[in-house]
Amino acid sequence: MKLARKIKNRLFRSKKKTQKENTAVIVHPADNRVFSLFDKTKRIEENQQVPVRKISEFSWNGSILKIAGYMYIKGLPLQKEDQVRKRLLLVNNGVLFTAVSLRDIPVDQLSIDTSNVPGAYKWAGFSQQINFSKLMNDKPLPQGEYKLFLEIEAVDDQNVKHQEVHTVGNVSNFLSNDVYATKMEFHSAKKLMKFNLIVNYDEGEKTINLSCNKLQEIDPSLLELDTGKEANRFIRKLNTSLFHFAYDVFRLLPIKSNKIVFASDSRLDVTGNFEFVYEELLKREENFDFKFFLKSSIRDRKSLSELMSMAYHFATSKIIFIDDFYPIIYPLKIRKNADLVQLWHAVGAFKTFGYSRIGLPGGPSPHSKNHRNYTKVIVSSENIRKHYAEGFGVDIENVIATGVPRTDFFFDEAKKAFVKERLYTEYPFLKDKKVILFAPTFRGNGQQSAHYPFEVLDFDRLYRELKDEYIFLFKIHPFVRNDANIPYQYSDFFYDFSSFREINELLLVTDVLITDYSSVCFEYALLNKPMIFFSYDVDDYIRKRDFYYDYFDFIPGPLAKTSDQMISIIKEEKYNFEQIDSFVHYFFDDLDGKASERVVDQIVFPQEEEPVDDKVLKR
């Protein structure tokens, strides 16, 4: 209690000092600065009464605190929402470290009996969800010892501000075993940090203690088995230079018109769009010479012999198919009678990518060579050609609306039946209950910093509310490096399918898809089944990443920002089926299962005459 009074006095003196300094400033009539009601009050009165407060909720899910309750000063009515504000103060060694705004709510919206609160204090209620992993500019709470206090500020009808600081009070009944502990992580391309966060009740000060201890801080690249880093960096640079030199030499050789290359740094086998284009090419019974250069990750090393082979076949192939970001090819000048074709792995156009992100956090340099040498890009509809042209920095004439080959799968009834039967045989539990598939995109600026903050999911509540009717599958983006860490007591409900390669197969056995900003919504829409957009950070995502369309009008399903909202939508089946049909017809020109045919017809066997080059070998 003594510490609360000290904190209050410091805040009060600071605000009085600021007020005196401000009153010495002559405000010119032409000065059109706008202040909040709390910043332009005539004077501040230090309250002499102990405020009334009660905590109705103090629960933790990972590093996320949900706090609610009420607080008011006797004799100071709170009838108007815009005349009161409350904050949770974090105090380190007696000094205010930071303050988190609390959302003001009417007291009758709280989950406890508030009949003893006089009607004059209608806006005494508050609630907030605070993520301590993202507290400081998207970084965790720094290492240190903190105490929590509540602050209330209220402006009366005479434009006088009243302010009070008080302890949170005894919330030990909300803490199992009188203590709570969790871990926090921070991911970026150059830094990985891990913390322990310990929460307990301070009997002396009658408030909450937070103890944050840093466990680890390391450069993620050091976690890779890479001895002799400087030497390896030199060797990689040398190998890359040799690759470029070899490519230029091999360009002097004739193009082999029946040679087709498939290259990817995100798959080890011929799956996805590659699979459907490859199978269509086999149907044509032509004498194709196929070459495959496949790696599971952009981090996988390529040996010098591999690079020489790639240089030769890239230089002498008629067509090179890629399906993702493929950096080694971007500095190359593609030959006049050859094609570099991007069979982009994502369908539709949703969140901005590539050069559409110039100027945004993690966006590319305008002078980058990435993507610009594509001679062809395939997309799902005419409506999105302009977005892919902008994102890849290519002419719109190079973007062709053939449809996306892997979506042919959804129109092949025999193949769908076979896949479903195979899945039910391999995973019998998929048949017993309805299936929820959780498939969000990653957070971070790219592969090196990719992660997902699983603490935003309330595992316990999802389990208790949905386990009788559903099972919950995780299909996390392959870039994500942190794990869901499913608690063992929920292992009959949560299942991790992140290593399952083809998400389109899982969509067949899915009853409800939960995603956020992932392009999986386009393919799932072809099945006309319900989806939920769990976008807890949509405001931040719009600011940092942005979209090609207004997100709230775009999504063909309800928006949920919390686990509670997600559960409510599922249990009450509040889905937006009526929006799915128009969504599908905007992002897909052809719903016939013949996208692979069109890709082969328009790229491998184009109808128009091409200029003849005497360096092109005949089959």
Curated annotation (Swiss-Prot):
Pathway: Cell wall biogenesis; poly(ribitol phosphate) teichoic acid biosynthesis. Its main location: membrane. It comes from Bacillus spizizenii (strain ATCC 23059 / NRRL B-14472 / W23). The keyword Membrane applies. Gene3D superfamilies: 3.40.50.11820, 3.40.50.12580. InterPro entries: Glycerophosphate_synth, TagF_C, TagF_N, Teichoic_Acid_Biosynth. It is a peripheral membrane protein. It is found in: Cell membrane. Responsible for the polymerization of the main chain of the major teichoic acid by sequential transfer of ribitol phosphate units from CDP-ribitol to the glycerol phosphate attached to the disaccharide linkage unit. Synthesizes polymers of up to 40 ribitol phosphate units in length. The gene is tarL. GO terms for cellular component: plasma membrane. One of its GO terms (biological process) is cell wall organization. It comes from the Bacteria. GO terms for molecular function: CDP-glycerol glycerophosphotransferase activity. Belongs to the CDP-glycerol glycerophosphotransferase family. It catalyses: 4-O-[1-D-ribitylphospho-(2R)-1-glycerylphospho]-N-acetyl-beta-D-mannosaminyl-(1->4)-N-acetyl-alpha-D-glucosaminyl di-trans,octa-cis-undecaprenyl diphosphate + n CDP-L-ribitol = 4-O-[(D-ribitylphospho)(n)-D-ribitylphospho-(2R)-glycerylphospho]-N-acetyl-beta-D-mannosaminyl-(1->4)-N-acetyl-alpha-D-glucosaminyl di-trans,octa-cis-undecaprenyl diphosphate + n CMP + n H(+). Its EC number is 2.7.8.47. Keywords: Cell membrane, Cell wall biogenesis/degradation, Membrane, Teichoic acid biosynthesis, Transferase. This is Teichoic acid poly(ribitol-phosphate) polymerase. The keyword Flavoprotein does not apply.
